[in-house]
């Protein structure tokens, strides 16, 4: 992944966010695009120091390889939500969500932060498999995918959010598991009228999946 970026619509414009936490507003008019930087504190949530095994990663070189950083953005009701890999110290990581009201400057605050972590000392640790896709869900909540970082046992454990799709309350960050047994779900969409969601994920060597959850009754 070379400095991946994410976009979503806000009114008639786009907000364009790089994996390194730089945000631009993109105005579309007369077949021309104009970009203007948006001041924010987003980069403050991202890793500034790296362990030796990841020493080649440099967020401030746009051509460097980055396995951490922002994983998705989602805009709804004048708020922007961003998922990212949070550093909990002592070589522990997991996927978290922050939010900001959309104003001239974006001040992000923590919305959801897991209580379990994945250690980078694990032999097969892979931050690429972190999920992070965000979509609207019902009852004033979001859907978030969280990968298992190649800790395969976590996907079936109800004590871990890894290898799961969870719903998160937009106001207080409370969450519940709505689907488990995933590897690295990255595609996600919810269909409100029919009340079901679809997720996709990569298999290790082929074997990609499309999963339908058609019974979300009682899930919030």
Regions found by a protein language model. Name each.
Residues 174-175, 218-220:
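Acidic/polar loop patches that form or flank catalytic/metal-binding clefts of enzymes
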Residues 1-152, 187-190, 194-203:
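Acidic, Gly/Ser/Thr-rich repeat motifs that build Ca2+-stabilized beta-propeller blades
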Residues 151-204:
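Loop-centered beta-sheet repeat module
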Residues 26-28, 154-156, 209-211:
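A short, polar/proline- and glycine-enriched secondary-structure boundary/capping micro-motif
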Residues 93-105, 156-171, 212-215:
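Beta-propeller blade signature
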């Amino acid at each position: 992944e070379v400095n991946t970026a994410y976009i979503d619509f806000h009114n008639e414009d786009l907000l364009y966010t790089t994996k390194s936490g730089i945000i631009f507003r993109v105005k579309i008019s007369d077949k021309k695009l104009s970009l203007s930087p948006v001041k924010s504190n987003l980069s403050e949530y991202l890793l500034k120091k790296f362990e030796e095994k990841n020493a080649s990663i440099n967020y401030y070189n746009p051509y460097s390889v980055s396995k951490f950083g922002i994983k998705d953005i989602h805009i709804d009701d004048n708020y922007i939500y961003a998922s990212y890999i949070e550093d909990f110290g002592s070589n522990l990581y997991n996927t978290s969500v922050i939010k900001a009201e959309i104003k001239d400057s974006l001040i992000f605050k923590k919305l959801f932060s897991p209580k379990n972590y994945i250690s980078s000392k694990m032999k097969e640790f892979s931050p690429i498999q972190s999920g992070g896709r965000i979509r609207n869900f019902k009852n004033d909540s979001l859907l978030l995918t969280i990968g298992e970082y190649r800790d395969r046992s976590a996907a079936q454990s109800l004590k871990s959010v890894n290898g799961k799709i969870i719903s998160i309350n937009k106001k207080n960050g409370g969450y519940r598991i709505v689907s488990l047994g995933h590897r690295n779900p990255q595609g996600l969409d919810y269909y409100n009228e029919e009340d079901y969601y679809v997720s996709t994920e990569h298999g290790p060597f082929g074997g990609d999946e499309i999963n339908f959850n058609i019974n979300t009754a009682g899930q919030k």
